[in-house]
C-alpha cells in the first residue's frame, strides 16, 4: 500500500484495519469458533470477519427481552447474502435454495434484496457450514458479499435487449471474478478445502483489503434499475446497432450517512468519461486500487469512495485511475435514463423467448395465507426451461420461457398468488429494506411497515382522484440506506421506533437526491403531510409532472444539486 502519498489520510488507524491485518487473510479463528457450541455467536474479531465470507451475525430482536428474562443469550444466528453477479439463477439452483430455506432457517423464507441477490435469514451455527456446502454443490458462493471488498456486482435485468444484456451480464461476471479476494480462506473453512502451506497474496485488494465496502454495477440505459448513484463504480453500457461498444464510467456514488454527523451525506456518482469494452477490467482494477490506497483508513465513517473523491478532488482521482490503468477516458457518450421500475408481467424478447416478471412485495418469498409464493416459485422451477433473474427492485423474472411452457408457467403463477391483476402502480414503485426484527442496525420498521404504508398512500392518491399515478416511495430502517430512500421521490429514513426523517424531491429516474422535509416524525404525521402535498400535486401539477419534480418547482423543498454543500443547507 502507498503510504507516502499526499492523499493518504494520516493518523491512528481504525480498529478494523488491525483485525483485517491480523486475520491471516480473513481466516481469523472462525473455524475454532464454529466448534464452540456454548454460544450461537461468533466472538471477537470473527464477528466482523464472517462478513467477508458473506454473513452478518444477527439475532431476533422481537425475542430479546423475553430471552433476557429467561437468562438466555439473544437468539444468535447469521444472515447469508449470496454472490450472484447480475442476479441469474438456474432452476436447479433455485430448488436447492428453496429446500435449505425451508428446512434449515428460522424464517423459512428466501429474501430477494436490493443487491440483486438472495439472503437466507436465521441460520443457526450448526447449519452454517452445511449452508455453504449446499450452495457450493449448485455452483453458488457468498465470497465478498459483505465486508471491505467489492460486493455483489449488479447488472440491469433487461431481458428485451437480449444481445446487449448478455454481453453486459458477462462483463458483470468478469468484474466480479477479477475483483474477488484471492485468499483460500473461504474454501478452507466452509468447503473443507485442503490447507496448503502457501502465502496468500491479494494483488488488487491488498493484505488489509479496502478501507470500506465497495459496490459496482453494470447499467443498460434507458433502465436505471440498479440505481447507479447508490454505487462506488458504475459501467453504463453504450451500444451501437445492438452491439455493446463500451461504457461510460461513473465513480463515487453512495447513500449511507450517520444521523447527526454532517460530515456524512449521500452523493451522486461522478462521470469520468467513456472507455472501450476491452478496457473494462483495467479501469475497474485501477478505481479499486486508487480507493484502496487513498481511502480513509482512520475514520470509517468517511472511508467510502464518495468521501475520497470529495477530499482529493474528482480530477485528481480520475488522473490517478488513468495513470494506473494506462487508459485515457474519452468524452462521455450520450445516454438517458427514463425509468427504474421492472416491467411486471409478460414481455417477449427479441429471441422469441418469453419473460415473466413477478412482483414480490419486499422481496420476501414465503408461503403466506392464501398466497403460497414460495411453493409457487418452486413449482415453476420444476418445469422451467430458462433461468430466473433477480432484480435490484427485489422482484423475480422467470426468464427465457419457451412458447410451449408459457401457459403452464402462467397457470402455476396465478394459482399461487404470484400474479395479481389489480396491483397498483404505487405498490410496484415502493420498496423497503429488511430492518426489524433481524437487522441489528434498524432503528425503525421498514419491510413490516411498507405494505400498510402503501395501502394508506394508495388511499391518498384515490382521494385526490389520481389513483392511477404513482410516486417512487422507499423506506429504510436506518441511515445506512439499503432501501435506497435517498434516491426516492419520497424517502423515509428510520430514526427511532415508529419515527422517520421524511425526505422529498428525488426524481423517477434516480438521478437526484431528496432533501429532508421533516425530522423524526411519526407514521400518522407522515401520511398527514403527504395528504396535503399530494392534494396540491393533483390540482397544480403541470402535464405529466412527477411528484418529485413538483415539490421542487413549487418551492416545497430545495433541490439538492451538490450534496456535499447543500444536502443539509
Curated annotation (Swiss-Prot):
Q: What does this protein do?
A: Component of the sulfite reductase complex that catalyzes the 6-electron reduction of sulfite to sulfide. This is one of several activities required for the biosynthesis of L-cysteine from sulfate.
Q: What is the lineage of its organism?
A: Bacteria, Pseudomonadati, Pseudomonadota, Gammaproteobacteria, Alteromonadales
List each coiled-coil range. Answer: none
What are the BP-aspect GO terms? cysteine biosynthetic process; hydrogen sulfide biosynthetic process; sulfate assimilation
Q: Which Gene3D superfamilies match?
A: Sulfite Reductase Hemoprotein, domain 1
Q: Which is a Pfam family this sequence falls into? A: NIR_SIR_ferr
Q: Which InterPro entries match?
A: CysI, NiRdtase/SiRdtase_haem-b_fer, Nit/Sulf_reduc_fer-like_dom_sf, NO2/SO3_Rdtase_4Fe4S_dom, NO2/SO3_Rdtase_4Fe4S_prot, NO2/SO3_Rdtase_4Fe4S_sf, NO2/SO3_Rdtase_FeS/sirohaem_BS
Which residues are recorded as binding siroheme? 482
The reaction(s) catalysed by this protein are: hydrogen sulfide + 3 NADP(+) + 3 H2O = sulfite + 3 NADPH + 4 H(+)
| Keyword hit for Metal-binding | yes
Protein known as: Sulfite reductase [NADPH] hemoprotein beta-component
- Single GO MF annotation: heme binding
Which residues does UniProt assign to the signal peptide?
none
- Oligomeric form and interacting partners: Alpha(8)-beta(8). The alpha component is a flavoprotein, the beta component is a hemoprotein.
Residue sites binding [4Fe-4S] cluster per the record: 433, 439, 478, 482
Disulphide-bridged cysteine pairs: none
The record's remark on the cofactor is: Binds 1 siroheme per subunit. Binds 1 [4Fe-4S] cluster per subunit.
What organism does this protein naturally occur in? Pseudoalteromonas atlantica (strain T6c / ATCC BAA-1087)
State the top-level EC class: oxidoreductase
Similarity annotation: Belongs to the nitrite and sulfite reductase 4Fe-4S domain family.
The answer to keyword Oxidoreductase applying to this record is: yes
Keywords for this protein: 4Fe-4S, Amino-acid biosynthesis, Cysteine biosynthesis, Heme, Iron, Iron-sulfur, Metal-binding, NADP, Oxidoreductase
Q: In which pathway does it act?
A: Sulfur metabolism; hydrogen sulfide biosynthesis; hydrogen sulfide from sulfite (NADPH route): step 1/1
Q: What is its EC number?
A: 1.8.1.2
Amino acid at each position: 500500500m502507498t503510504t507516502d502519498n499526499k492523499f493518504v489520510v494520516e493518523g491512528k488507524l481504525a480498529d478494523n484495519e488491525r483485525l483485517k491485518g491480523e486475520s491471516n487473510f480473513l481466516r481469523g479463528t472462525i473455524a475454532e469458533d464454529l466448534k464452540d457450541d456454548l454460544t450461537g455467536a461468533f466472538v471477537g474479531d470473527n464477528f466482523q470477519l464472517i462478513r467477508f465470507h458473506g454473513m452478518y451475525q444477527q439475532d431476533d430482536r422481537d425475542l430479546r427481552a423475553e430471552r433476557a428474562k429467561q437468562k438466555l443469550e439473544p437468539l444468535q444466528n447469521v444472515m447469508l447474502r449470496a454472490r450472484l453477479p447480475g442476479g441469474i439463477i438456474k432452476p436447479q439452483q433455485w430448488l436447492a435454495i428453496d429446500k435449505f430455506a425451508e428446512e434449515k432457517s428460522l424464517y423459512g423464507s428466501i429474501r430477494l434484496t436490493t443487491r440483486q441477490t438472495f439472503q437466507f435469514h436465521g441460520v443457526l451455527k450448526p447449519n452454517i457450514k452445511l449452508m455453504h456446502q449446499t450452495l457450493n454443490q449448485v455452483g453458488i458462493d457468498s465470497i465478498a458479499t459483505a465486508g471491505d471488498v467489492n460486493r455483489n456486482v449488479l447488472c440491469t435485468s433487461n431481458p428485451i435487449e437480449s444481445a446487449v444484456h448478455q454481453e453486459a451480464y458477462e462483463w458483470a461476471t468478469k468484474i466480479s471474478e477479477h475483483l474477488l479476494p484471492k485468499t483460500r480462506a473461504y474454501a478452507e473453512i466452509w468447503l473443507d478445502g485442503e490447507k496448503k502451506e502457501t502465502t496468500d497474496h491479494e494483488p488488487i485488494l491488498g493484505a488489509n483489503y479496502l478501507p470500506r465496502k465497495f459496490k459496482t454495477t453494470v447499467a443498460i440505459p434507458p433502465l436505471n434499475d440498479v440505481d447507479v448513484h447508490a454505487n462506488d463504480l458504475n459501467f453504463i453500457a453504450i451500444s451501437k446497432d445492438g452491439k455493446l461498444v463500451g461504457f461510460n464510467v461513473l465513480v463515487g456514488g453512495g447513500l449511507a450517512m450517520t444521523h447527526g454527523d454532517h460530515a456524512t451525506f449521500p452523493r451522486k456518482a461522478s462521470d469520468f468519461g467513456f472507455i472501450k469494452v476491452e478496457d473494462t477490467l483495467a479501469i475497474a482494477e485501477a478505481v479499486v486500487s486508487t480507493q484502496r490506497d487513498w481511502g480513509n483508513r482512520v475514520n470509517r465513517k468517511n472511508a467510502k469512495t464518495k468521501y475520497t473523491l470529495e477530499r482529493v478532488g474528482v480530477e485528481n482521482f480520475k488522473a490517478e485511475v488513468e495513470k494506473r490503468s494506462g487508459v485515457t477516458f474519452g468524452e462521455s457518450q450520450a445516454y438517458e435514463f427514463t425509468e427504474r421500475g421492472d416491467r411486471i408481467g409478460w414481455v417477449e424478447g427479441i429471441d422469441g423467448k418469453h419473460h415473466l416478471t413477478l412482483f414480490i412485495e419486499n422481496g420476501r418469498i414465503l408461503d403466506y395465507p392464501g398466497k403460497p409464493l414460495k411453493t409457487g416459485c418452486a413449482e415453476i422451477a420444476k418445469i422451467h426451461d430458462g433461468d430466473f433473474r433477480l432484480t435490484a427492485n427485489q422482484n423475480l423474472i422467470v426468464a427465457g420461457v419457451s412458447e410451449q411452457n408459457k401457459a403452464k408457467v402462467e397457470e402455476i403463477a396465478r394459482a399461487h398468488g404470484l400474479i395479481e391483476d389489480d396491483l397498483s402502480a404505487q405498490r410496484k414503485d415502493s420498496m423497503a429494506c429488511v430492518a426489524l426484527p433481524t437487522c441489528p442496525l434498524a432503528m425503525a420498521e421498514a419491510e413490516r411497515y411498507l405494505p400498510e404504508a402503501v395501502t394508506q398512500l394508495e388511499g391518498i392518491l384515490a382521494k385526490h382522484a389520481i389513483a392511477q399515478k404513482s410516486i417512487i416511495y422507499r423506506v429504510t430502517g436506518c441511515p445506512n440506506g439499503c432501501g435506497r430512500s435517498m434516491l426516492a421521490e419520497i424517502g423515509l429514513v428510520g430514526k427511532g421506533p415508529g419515527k422517520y426523517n421524511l425526505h422529498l424531491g428525488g426524481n423517477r429516474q434516480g438521478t437526484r437526491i431528496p432533501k429532508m422535509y421533516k425530522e423524526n416524525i411519526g407514521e400518522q404525521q407522515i401520511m398527514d403531510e403527504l395528504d396535503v402535498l399530494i392534494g396540491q400535486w393533483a390540482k397544480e401539477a403541470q402535464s405529466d409532472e412527477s411528484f418529485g419534480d413538483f415539490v421542487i418547482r413549487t418551492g416545497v423543498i430545495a433541490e439538492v444539486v451538490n450534496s456535499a454543500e447543500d444536502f443539509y443547507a
